[in-house]
């Protein structure tokens, strides 16, 4: 799937903690980053199929004063390094605390809409992969298809009613790539 210069691209929006990497309570140290097995390869397959890869992450630890934005950026850089050779097209985060209602904090779709504007994304052809009910809700609120992975909190959040539930990011990528094959065959 390639896009012409004036055409919108499809994207895969990704939760970070519990989806790409093992859940760490308020991860503020790059040494705590532990990418799940198969994640770099799955991301690379999606990238090669033409999907933009965009991380959408709540980072309330900043708003609560548990860590600083520079500390968050160091963790973000380690995640990016750990998934090479795949690369992210964008990383969007919301530092707000949960008690502050904003249009950016998941489950609100503000970060997805921001990425859509920045990256010329066709939401109708896009997906959100996450391990939490708020990831599924965020994706639904933005009008994208949703996949709940059972890594992180996902094993306990199946009531979120995603479009698909799967064990991990590799299996989620397989679903997307198979759907892509079916749509190209039509």
Regions found by a protein language model. Name each.
Residues 14, 31-35, 51, 92-93, ...:
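Broad hydrophobic/π-residue packing in well-ordered secondary structure
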Residues 2-54:
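Active-site neighborhood of HAD-like aspartate-dependent phosphohydrolases
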Residues 18, 25, 58, 94, ...:
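Generic signal for short, ordered secondary-structure residues
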Residues 13, 56, 60, 125, ...:
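Short, flexible coil/turn micro-motifs enriched in small/turn-prone residues
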Residues 39, 43-76, 87-99, 139:
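Substrate-recognition element of Asp-dependent hydrolases with the DxDx(T/V) motif
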Residues 15-17, 58, 131, 135:
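Acidic active-site catalytic centers that drive phospho-/nucleotidyl reactions
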Residues 16-37, 62-71, 84-86, 96-103:
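Metal-dependent phosphoesterase signature
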Residues 2-8, 69-90, 98-128, 132-186:
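Asp-based, Mg2+/Mn2+-dependent phosphohydrolase catalytic module
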